[in-house]
Amino acid sequence: MIATSTQLKTHLAELQERSGMHHPDTYRAWNEYIDALVAENQLDAAAAEFSALLTVREQSYGKKSSETIPLRRKFANFLYQAGDVRDAGTQFAVLQEVAAHNLGPEHLETLHAQEQVAQCLNRLGNVEGATQIFSRVYTSRRHVQGKDHPDTLTSWAHYTVSLGKTGKHKEALAECEKLLPRFTAVWGETDERTVIMHAKRAAALHALQRYDEAIEEYEQTIESYVRVFGPADPSTFKIRNQYAICLSNAHHADAAVAHTAALLDDSRKVFGPHHPKTLRYWNSYAAGLANQNELEESLMEFHDLLATRLELFGENHPDTLHTILGYAKILDGANRHEDAAEFYRALIDLVIKDRGENHPDVIRLRTIYARSLLAAGNYEKASTEFDLARRAARDVFGETHKRYFIIWSQYATTLVCLDRYEEALTEFEGLLAVSRQINGDDSLETIELRYDYMRTLFALGRVDDAWSEYDVLVQDCTRIYGEDHSTTRHVQEFGAQFAGEIAEPKNPVE
């Protein structure tokens, strides 16, 4: 009969009383008690006992004693598996230090702890830091264990995957190309580790927009996943979804939708119609239909998906919010701008409640909402929303940040639509000063702003100033792009058009 945690706790208390906190029998009993707590899923209690026992162990032998290594390793692994990644990382870092002090910097215990620190950093979003550690561990394992040792290859794989997460896809692909033959030689082509590395190669090709190669790699990898993991395994569904995304990015819309439809059907059978994975594939399917320009069918799918997510999760769930956004974007694409604007407005209110007025997500949504209002011809309301978004963006990102600059530009353009030319001119002057600072005098952004500034001068009737701006702008466009470039011709065509008009030109924004 297996003793319960309650029984083991009583036994432990007796030993602590009789033999003392530092006795070996007490240590063993304490470990058994912790194991029972973990088995009974009493994780908070187990964490507290781990911490207490580790403190006693340090008191007995010293914090840097090798006698603390097994218990600290066990505690760190427990924290990691329990999802307490930050505290786990702290314990692994101390474990690495103690192991290096007692066993040496390239001892396997030290390298294992160091690698676990990197895993924790990865989970916490510090991918750059994790990549640096993975690189050091891989180098040490090559020196200590040899280049083809399984541990060395595993560390190499961790480093390769981490490179991809940092956005260094070219470097990640190069490592994949070198690593795959080693994996095949050591473990074989059908080993799950080899199969997973093929998936990483496909992802790197995908990220580098080498779509034909990526599609071929994905197709072969999917077959391997089905053989190795089975058609119903979550990892098989994941790689199939990545393949569908790659097809879509490669503009194979029909193939992408067909594959996503099959993926959705299989997910409903394997996981059920309301499983989060199924609902995500449903969202991808609805979006794919829109990419095929099947807007009405896409809207019907989004409508049903939104109703399902509202019923299951409520309006504040991230997946529900994501679907509302997708639905609104398709409405915009179908030229139902007023309907789209209503959904954007509702979405903004929901996100503000959860994240606050100046959260970056609110700024992004407010900008999208303003564009929808602009497309619907509601210029006054659009200018108000652009103004709110730009003020928040200035506070959050700063006056020279690209996101603030873009929103500010859209606000100025909307003022022109409202015939508020004097205000628009002031905004364009400020924008030009910032654009020259962050983009440069000869950048396309600066040239476009000078064009808008010139047109606004014409609209205000400041014809002499406008023609002066025009002459300099044509000279600069010719110098930067050449006489026959579309940008140069566009400016010249506007000048010719204005010169041929007697009356004041109409709204300068097309």
Enumerate the language-model features and the residues they cover.
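Intrinsic-disorder-linked linear interaction elements in eukaryotic regulatory proteins
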Residues: M1-E510
